[in-house]
Curated annotation (Swiss-Prot):
Chief localization: plastid
Species: Chlamydomonas sp. (strain WXM)
Protein name per Swiss-Prot or TrEMBL: Large ribosomal subunit protein uL16c
PANTHER family for this protein: 50S/60S RIBOSOMAL PROTEIN L16, LARGE RIBOSOMAL SUBUNIT PROTEIN UL16M
NCBIfam families for the chain: rplP_bact
Cellular compartments annotated: Plastid, Chloroplast
Subunit structure: Part of the 50S ribosomal subunit.
Keyword Mitochondrion included in the entry's annotation: no
Family under the similarity heading: Belongs to the universal ribosomal protein uL16 family.
Amino acid sequence: MLSPKRTKFRKPHRGHLRGKATRGNTIVFGDFALQAQEPCWITSRQIEAGRRVLTRYVRRGGKLWIRIFPDKAVTMRPAGTRMGSGKGAPDYWVAVVHPGKILYEMQGVSETIARQAMRIAAYKMPVKTKFLTKQA
């Protein structure tokens, strides 16, 4: 699963999911893409689940790009711990996704295969998504 090698701070603030994606909202590498329609946190496990579906579906013919990276640590306290005594330890990693952000890109397969693969990968995502094709 994806995670940063090192970060400047171990425990980041949660932040807000306001506004739309201003960067990473156009197709750059491939011909087909899966775009987020809602704001959310996508965990490294969910990104990996989507990647597995797409690589299995397209086999050797296609090329896949993952356009998001989980660089934010989410902390959790142990179950049954009393209030206080500081913030919990980092538990898992998430990618902060705003509406319009491209999640995956694909190339080297037909549109029908790409559409089916992206639809299955969309089931693994915790957010509504949209299938995009590159405008010539």
